[in-house]
Amino acid sequence: MNLTKKPLVIVGSGFAGINTALNLKKFDLDIPIIIIDSQPSFLFKPLMYEVLSGEIKQWEVTPNLETIFSNSGITFLQNKLCEVDFSMNILKFQDNLHIEYQYLVLGTGSSHNSFSIKGVDENCYFFNDINDLDKLKIYLQQTTNNVKKDNLFIVGAGPSGVELACKLSDLYSNRFNIKIIEKADEILTKNKIFNKEEAEKALDKRKIDILLNTTVEEVTEKE
């Protein structure tokens, strides 16, 4: 990549990366701005639940990043970062591309954490990105002909866990007994009381069991 000036590079194109890039551009900085991600599309995570239910299509929540940054003066580069040499200010990529930067912003987001619990990575589904969503959809499709209800456990009673439980109950209450496992003594521990009360009403209406003060020690294969 030929650059006359060392760029400001943002690694990661989630909400943080995109907003940082667009807001920095408003300052009319006299250096190139490059945003880099291994994926070609942005994922609007708050609507993953609606994609799961089929209320909206997957393409509606995954706009193309080149399109987002077209005519913005920001360069989007799809590539996978392998190493950062902080002493030399150099980024090294999967295809042997090296970029020397002037400023670096790391906004690579989060990944799931199994907390070293045995069997989690092998026997659980996650809900953090499009690949997770696709895997969960395939599993749910495979349960279409279930003769009896299975127990479906969701670990974590934060906003994501509660919303996912409600959505799955709306779609598959005839296939699953849905239960939420939470290690704390209440759901939505960081939310306002009103939000907790409304969430409890939604869960109670759907007859979703909440197992508080409960931790997972191991996850085994379904028998």
Enumerate the predicted regions with their spans.
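Short, conserved loop/turn and helix-capping segments at secondary-structure boundaries
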Residues: 55, 59, 118, 127-130, ...
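Beta1-alpha1 glycine-rich phosphate/pyrophosphate-binding loop at the start
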Residues: 2-74, 153-154, 163-193
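A Rossmann-like FAD-binding core segment of flavoenzymes
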Residues: 76-79, 83, 171-223
